[in-house]
Every structure is written in structure tokens, then in C-alpha cells.
Amino acid sequence: MTPAWLDRAEYPFATRRVTIEGIGMSYVDDGEGPTVLMVHGTPSWSFLYRHLVRGLRDGYRCVAPDLPGFGLSDKPAGDAYRPEDQARRLTAFIDALGLKDFTLVVHDFGGPIGLAHAVDQPERVRNLVIFNTWMWSLEQSRQVAWLIRALSGRMGRLLYERLGFSVNVLWRQAVRDRRYTPAVHAQYAAALRAPAARHATWIYAREVLGSSAWLEALWQRRERIARLPALLVWGMKDPAFASALPRWRALFTDARVVEWPDVGHAPPEVRGPESAALVRRFLEEPRRTA
């Protein structure tokens, strides 16, 4: 059932559902052609990629799932929202839809979650499109470690679940753009309206450090994706991941890099049509098919 708060002018896509590990997952599957799989982070959902879907669906099959705990997907209670849990479910989702030879698009927590599949099965991925994200342990960052430890306790859980700290504070501050209107913000906030629906956002925050071993193991296998054609699109005003770009740039042997100095954490949101155009040009370069 479509929720009453959903703005169909902004998100006009038909959604489908599939059950993964007993959890109902909503996803967009629009267009025909080579497949482009788009994986969101926190506190976002497939709404983040609406501009990419609009800009690519006339020549590509655009698949954009809502990971469990987010968007229009089920949000069961419990702590099974670690990135490694979500990565396992994403692979099950990919298998359920029979996706192969696809372009993988990732952002934020969608980075390690989606790229884990690429690291495990690089032969199934044709290209990578990477927006502001990371794929390594952040334990050595004293500022990050201090903040996450402070947010991992009872007070942090209260902030995330009762006050919507992730979507109403951190996300807003990280995006910081006049194009991010109250009406657009309402689509992110409404998907996490109830305190119980915000639980996954707190688990994600906790696991920035809690999943450090998994993240570091993922980074140690990074050479498995180093030769994939990659497009790196970076908002350089991002307080979280602006500084991560050089590490990504050094990894890939075949990368196109676009830096937007006036953009924050979410280029697909605030530069949506431009992002779609960049992705299309990247995919249409000689020898590149999604």
C-alpha cells in the first residue's frame, strides 16, 4: 500500500516487493536495457535516486531497493542492521532478481554494503559509480571514534529513535543546500516518522565502529575491484567524506573523477539531474556498457 505521505510528483515510480530473510523489501524496477543497481545509505532510501532513475530509465533498467529498516521496506525490531547483515541481504536481493553484469551505484553506507558484493563477486559488476562514502575502518579517526562512542549508548539511542537525530539533524547538516527544500526533507523524515522505524539508523551509527573488523577486512580485499571502471562523484563540502576522495582515487586504475566544491554529502539529491547526466555519459563512453 502506498503511504499517504508519499509525493507521487517527486517519486512517480511503481514499486515492487520481494521477501528477503523474511523481510519485505520494496524496490523500484523501471526501464529496460543494461541494469543499473542503486544502493542507498542512512537515513535515506530509494527516493535519493529518483533523479537518476528519471534520467536513465529510457535506456537502462534502473533497480533501486529500500534496504530493510528504511524507506518503504519492512522495519522489524532487533539489531540485525549491521552493514554485514545488509550486505548479505543485498546479495540475496540481487540473486532473487537474477541481476548480473550491472553497474553498481553507491552512496554513504550503501558504499560498504554494496561494494561488499562487488568485492565478493566482481565478475557480476560491470562498472562502479561511487558518491561520498567509505569502505574501511574509521577507528583511527579520533574525532569519529569519540562521536560514535558517545552516540552508541543509551543517550544516543534516545536521540536517534525518539528525536530522529539522523534524519532531522545529521542528514540536514551534511546536505546543507538551498535545493534541499522542506518538501523534499519531508519525504525522508516521513519514512522514519515513528520512533520504532528509526531503530536501524541508530544501529548504523553504532556500527561505524562496531563493524570495524568487517570494514577493515573489506578494505583489505579492495584490489578485487580496483580494475573495474569507476566514476567518482564527490561533494567536497561533505563534513563526513570529503577527505575520503584521494583514497578512492588511488585505488582505481580506470576512474573518472568529478568534484563539486559547493556540494555537501548527497550529490544525487541536490545535483540529481546533473548526476544522472554524468552517469549516462560515463556508461556511454566507448567499451562501457552497464
Task: For the regions a language model picked out, list residue spans one by one.
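Alpha/beta-hydrolase fold catalytic core
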Residues: 1-35, 57-60, 95, 99-100, ...
